[in-house]
Amino acid sequence: MSQVAYLPVGKREQTKVQNRQAILDAAREVFGELGYEACTVRDIIRRTGLAAGTFYNYYRSKDEVYVALSDEGARRFTPLLKAQRAQSADWSSFVRAAIEAYFGFLADEHKSWLARRPVDEPIPHVHGETPEMTAVFNEVRQAIVDEIARGGAPGADPDYLAAACIAIAREVGEKMVARRPIDTKAAADFVVALIEGGVKGLPKSPV
């Protein structure tokens, strides 16, 4: 079961957190068993044991539930990314450590519910920016800015480079979990080589 990142005060707030977590846990199971496209909100509600009205107090659609699950994943990954940045001596070591941590995280998530789905089933993309996604982006961007400041990375545009690194890792990660067996090392080697090689050819830009 996933972890809740905060502790509420008061019985009412405790109930809200428990209901929200029950919906997310049920959705994770239903998405894994039936597939995102095939399942309905009713399938999720039945699994929670909550009333339909209670569900709609928190989410309006299965799309919103999927976004919430994505947010939860990003929230849990952000501390891992911070730890990698703190432990890395330079830009290259950070890229390697961050990509390996991300792909390991994806592989673990895959075991929880994606592994029960057909390998060729499309995974829905989350559109729009959430606070958790922004936190991941900002952590990558700050790592790039820090490395530029101490001369460990070329003076590339940090916003563009952070966005490119995240996009590459996300897209390759989707392909990685669709393969059998899942090879996190091969995927990480490919992405690191692509990022490092691409950075070398970038024009320098002041921060």
Task: Give, region by region, the residue ranges found by the protein language model.
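N-terminal intrinsically disordered/low-complexity leader segments
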Residues: M1-Q18, G155, P203-V207
